[in-house]
């Protein structure tokens, strides 16, 4: 829709079944507490299967053994994924030791998975361990509230280890925004923490009785790093500093990457600039954006319910004016900002506070003791002696933050001894995948298990063409929901079927352009053949400093996506 012909503010029609479920759930309680005591099944039944998502969990099963169990007349091996709420990715070493122990003692896979939304997940929690995991988190000051389903999810914040003062201020705002937008229901405390039911009725002044129409994602960004991939998110606060101090934010609204194969009403979209706001209006504006989306978002069709679609339907100016009205402010013109990169600086960086920060590359964020590389043990040993904190990055890496000079050698020795500082190529550092098989029920093709060997082959192509130290931002996502953020990559692979992917090209290094589909439903050999040819051309024909994605657009190999609502599928 253009601004001249905006659509209706509210979509009329039969509400989706998810809306019924939320309304009937008694503020997210459902019958989860009763279901916990049902030992006949390893899963949650009926509405509870979806309601547990509001409590930070997804019900999954091991798809590698699904058919085998069906043959044996057994139900799937149900287990939960739990995702922690961790604004800005900051976790204390005490908390880390607690989650390390839980992963080892109480999960099927024994691993900790860092996510590209700056938190960690446990995979493979059996039903009997579901309540204990929430209680363990609570005992160390953590929770899993609102990390899934139709709420404001984990709030991201640039992991900038260098500008310590600015990071500290931005991180405080990420925490404040997260707290302000949390659900107020007491369901979480009652079910998991055995807190008394109180006689007062629940109220949700911001989210409402049926919560948001769809998931909602928020970031706080410190330029020039776009490590948190702001354009994947509904609401983004871009930090504006004067003399190293935070003074306000530019607001960008309506980013999002999820699509559905073949559904032309769905598209990936970059966020739109609304304007600048001084710090004191931050929470009012955050609330206004969320409540506008709450009231105007499409509750009849979940595939069309995210903020990006609301913005396109009602028109950017209409949405922006409503946010101004609700927040009681007028946006100032956007202040200048620019992004220069989004990868993590692997290795040691000295902050302006003279403390050191060690960024460790964790391939696909999977922390486990591998043969010859006991990563999980290494991080536990570091956590036992480190006085600072850990920070999870949006690139699925881990920062050992605020290391004094006196501890630097000791921590480096532990990291090296446990394979945490093994040299990897620039290409590997800039490649990322979602979890996908065997645990994700939506997976159509491999992602995390596919990427390491696929990266080997791309490294060989770079070597063949004489550019082994170059890198291309490369992402693999197992389905079009897009958790791997392939829709902001220079090379994006989107799972279509086992062993088959759609190949997208034409994003850029800084994550401000959506890549277009180049080839559909192709196998790994076909993908590699295309990349061999195109990387060969890039190596020969590129301009100074020109990234692969920019080259594919300039050379006419792919047309850039300029207006996704209209040209994403062309």
Curated annotation (Swiss-Prot):
Entry-linked PANTHER family: SULFITE REDUCTASE [NADPH] SUBUNIT BETA, SULFITE REDUCTASE [NADPH] SUBUNIT BETA-RELATED
InterPro entries registered for this protein in UniProt: CysI, NiRdtase/SiRdtase_haem-b_fer, Nit/Sulf_reduc_fer-like_dom_sf, NO2/SO3_Rdtase_4Fe4S_dom, NO2/SO3_Rdtase_4Fe4S_prot, NO2/SO3_Rdtase_4Fe4S_sf, NO2/SO3_Rdtase_FeS/sirohaem_BS
Gene Ontology terms for molecular function: 4 iron, 4 sulfur cluster binding; heme binding; metal ion binding; NADP binding; sulfite reductase (ferredoxin) activity; sulfite reductase (NADPH) activity
GO cellular component: sulfite reductase complex (NADPH)
Organism: Salmonella dublin (strain CT_02021853)
Protein name: Sulfite reductase [NADPH] hemoprotein beta-component
Coiled coil regions in record: none
GO biological process: one example: hydrogen sulfide biosynthetic process
């Amino acid at each position: 829709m253009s601004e001249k012909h905006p659509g209706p503010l509210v979509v009329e029609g039969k509400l989706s079944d998810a809306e019924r479920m939320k309304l009937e759930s008694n503020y997210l309680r459902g019958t989860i507490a009763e279901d916990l005591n049902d030992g006949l099944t390893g899963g949650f039944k009926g509405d509870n299967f979806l309601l547990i998502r509001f409590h930070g969990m997804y019900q999954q099963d091991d798809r590698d053994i699904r058919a085998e169990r069906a043959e044996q007349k057994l139900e799937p091996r149900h287990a939960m994924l739990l995702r922690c709420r961790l604004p800005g990715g900051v976790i204390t070493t005490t908390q880390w030791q607690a989650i390390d122990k839980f992963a080892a003692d109480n999960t099927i896979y024994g691993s900790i998975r860092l996510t590209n939304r700056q938190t960690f997940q446990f995979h493979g929690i059996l039903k009997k361990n579901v309540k204990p995991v929430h209680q363990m988190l609570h005992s160390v000051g953590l929770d899993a509230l609102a990390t899934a389903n139709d709420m404001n999810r984990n709030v991201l914040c640039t992991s900038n280890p260098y500008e310590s003062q600015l990071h500290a201020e931005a991180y405080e705002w990420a925490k404040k925004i997260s707290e302000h937008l949390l659900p107020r229901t007491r369901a979480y405390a009652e079910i998991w923490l055995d807190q008394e039911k109180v006689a007062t009725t629940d109220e949700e002044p911001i989210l409402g009785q049926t919560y948001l129409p769809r998931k909602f994602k928020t970031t706080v960004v410190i330029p020039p790093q776009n490590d948190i991939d702001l354009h994947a998110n509904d609401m983004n606060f871009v930090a504006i500093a004067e003399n190293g101090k935070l003074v306000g934010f530019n607001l960008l609204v309506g980013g999002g990457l999820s699509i559905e194969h073949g559904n032309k009403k769905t598209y990936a979209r970059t966020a739109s600039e609304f304007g600048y706001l001084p710090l004191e209006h931050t929470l009012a504006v955050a609330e206004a954006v969320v409540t506008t989306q709450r009231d105007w978002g499409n509750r009849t069709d979940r595939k069309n319910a995210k903020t990006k679609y609301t913005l396109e339907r009602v028109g950017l100016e209409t949405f922006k004016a409503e946010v101004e009205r609700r927040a009681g402010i007028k946006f100032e013109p956007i202040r200048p900002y620019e992004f220069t990169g989004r990868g993590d600086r692997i290795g040691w960086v000295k902050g302006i506070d003279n403390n050191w920060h060690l960024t460790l590359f964790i391939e696909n964020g999977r922390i486990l003791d591998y043969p010859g590389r006991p990563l999980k043990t290494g991080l536990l040993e570091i956590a036992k002696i480190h006085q600072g904190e850990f920070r999870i990055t949006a690139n699925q890496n881990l920062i050992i933050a605020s290391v004094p000079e006196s501890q630097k050698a000791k921590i480096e020795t532990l990291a090296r001894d446990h394979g945490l500082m093994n040299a990897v190529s620039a290409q590997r550092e800039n490649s990322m995948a979602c979890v996908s098989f065997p645990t994700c029920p939506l997976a159509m093709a491999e992602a995390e298990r596919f990427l390491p060997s696929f990266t080997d082959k791309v490294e060989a192509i770079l070597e063949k063409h004489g550019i082994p130290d170059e890198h291309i931002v490369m992402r693999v996502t197992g389905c079009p929901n897009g958790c791997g953020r392939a829709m902001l990559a220079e090379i994006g692979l989107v799972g279509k079927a086992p062993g088959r992917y759609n190949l997208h090209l034409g994003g850029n290094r800084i994550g401000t352009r959506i890549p277009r589909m180049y080839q559909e439903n192709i196998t790994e050999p076909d993908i590699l053949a295309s990349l061999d040819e195109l990387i060969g051309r890039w190596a020969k024909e590129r301009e100074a400093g020109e990234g692969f994605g920019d080259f594919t657009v300039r050379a006419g190999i792919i047309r850039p996506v300029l207006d996704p609502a209209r040209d994403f599928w062309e």
